[in-house]
């Protein structure tokens, strides 16, 4: 069992072969999620770096931080992003992101992991503290389809049906942490991206607490 699976159930990285078939155009996914040139982006739970490399290409002079609990996954991600000078790597628990990150980010992406987080709103609060004012948090989730309907290479893939989150459920978990849903993006064939913007009221609350 991967380290990630022990804390966030059903979130371990899948076999590369079918993952690449499911996501043939990672660069297109990153563009659809409105990640822009020059941003500082955290790939939270980056695994072996499949989306990290695409983010690095998109942000150009910006920076991407691959963040994962499993050092072995980070080693694989570093290999996947070899030669990309705008990549940094940070091992740690996602629930300690803001403390470990130091400087705040423009954007945090969490792809295919949020469904397994035990306290989703607490994690979203941690992400909010790691973001600059007006920063974005994007959650990529499987559509709430029966698992037997989400096949890749003729096999059912993804988390169990009961773990899949409708976009309304994702919104209900994230918005109380100081975010507002900005956009829902369909990511065929089986995913959606929910892009949340950090609210000004949350930023003021952080300043008051400080």
Regions found by a protein language model. Give the residues of each.
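Class I SAM-dependent methyltransferase SAM/SAH-binding core
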Residues: 42, 48-97
């Amino acid at each position: 069992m991967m380290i990630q699976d022990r804390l966030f159930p059903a979130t371990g990285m899948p076999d590369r072969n079918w993952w690449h078939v499911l996501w043939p155009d990672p660069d297109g996914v990153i563009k659809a999620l409105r990640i822009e040139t020059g941003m500082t982006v955290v790939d939270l739970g980056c695994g072996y770096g499949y989306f990290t490399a695409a983010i690095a290409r998109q942000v150009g002079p910006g920076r991407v931080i691959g963040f994962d609990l499993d050092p072995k996954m980070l080693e694989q991600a570093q290999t996947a992003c070899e030669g990309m000078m705008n990549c940094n790597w940070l091992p740690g628990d996602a629930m300690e992101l803001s403390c470990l990150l130091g400087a705040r980010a423009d954007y945090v992406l969490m792809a295919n992991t949020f469904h397994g987080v035990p306290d989703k709103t607490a994690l979203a609060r941690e992400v909010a503290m790691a973001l600059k004012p007006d920063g974005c948090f994007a959650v990529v989730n499987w559509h709430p389809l029966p698992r037997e309907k989400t096949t890749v290479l003729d096999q059912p893939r993804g988390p169990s049906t009961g773990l899949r989150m409708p976009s309304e459920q994702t919104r209900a978990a994230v918005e109380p942490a100081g975010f507002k849903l900005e956009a829902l993006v369909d990511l065929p064939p089986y995913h959606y991206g929910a892009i949340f913007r950090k609210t000004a009221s949350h930023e003021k609350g952080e300043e008051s607490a400080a």
